[in-house]
């Protein structure tokens, strides 16, 4: 079933869009089934769960951290994380850099923007992000690589609102790229879109979609 679901989602994706299979709260067996069907990129949002899965699953899996990351947990994910999707403060970015330096590696990160009409979502406002980038301190952080932006649309049935939010992030991505990352080939990821809204996200320019329930079914809490 998982393999069929995966095949269906992948068949809908343009060449430039990659799938992050959101495996949080799902058992190793579910991930193994998706892995056997060819999926290599998986997303987790709990540090302890991600660490345990990393230890016991194939080492060529690319693990993405997609949850809200607390500064005191960074050291546990830095050794093996391929991409952190939710950097929502300079403090967090600096701490990732510090732990990455200790691990002697460079960690790929996305800056999370708050685009939804919901207080529960994390992220920089557009102005806060501009201020942080303009200040330039991030340029001194040699063990992180800012690879793009991430955002979550409002959880609503209003397709027009979702489209508007994704399009606003997409145009902000173009602004940030032009102003601060014009020569950075690595700044190319726009992570937006989940099981219920990834079609709208892709239409707005997403390069990474985060899909869980449409592949694995509902989660086991």
Positions of predicted regions on the chain:
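Divalent-metal-activated hydrolytic enzyme cores
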Residues: 207-208
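Conserved alpha/beta-domain cores
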Residues: 1-196, 202-204, 216
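Short C-terminal tail/terminal secondary-structure segment
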Residues: 211-221
């Amino acid at each position: 079933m998982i393999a069929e679901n995966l095949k269906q989602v992948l068949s809908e994706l343009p060449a430039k869009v990659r799938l992050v299979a959101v495996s949080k709260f799902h058992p190793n067996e579910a991930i193994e089934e998706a892995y056997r069907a060819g999926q290599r990129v998986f997303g987790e949002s709990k540090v302890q769960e991600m660490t345990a899965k990393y230890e016991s699953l194939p080492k060529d899996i690319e693990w993405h951290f997609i949850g809200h990351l607390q500064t005191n947990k960074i050291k546990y994910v830095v050794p093996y994380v391929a991409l952190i999707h939710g950097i929502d403060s300079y403090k967090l970015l600096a701490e990732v850099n510090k732990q990455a330096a200790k691990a002697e590696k460079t960690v790929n990160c996305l800056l999370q923007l708050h685009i939804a009409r919901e207080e529960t979502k994390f992220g920089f406002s557009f102005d806060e992000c501009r201020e942080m980038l303009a200040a330039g301190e991030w340029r001194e952080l040699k063990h992180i690589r800012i690879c793009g932006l991430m955002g979550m649309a409002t959880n609503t049935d209003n397709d027009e609102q979702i489209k508007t939010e994704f399009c606003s992030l997409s145009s902000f991505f173009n602004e940030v790229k032009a102003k601060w990352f014009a020569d950075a080939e690595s700044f190319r990821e726009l992570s937006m879109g989940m099981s219920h809204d990834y079609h709208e996200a892709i239409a707005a320019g997403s390069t990474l979609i985060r899909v869980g329930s449409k592949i694995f079914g509902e989660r086991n809490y």
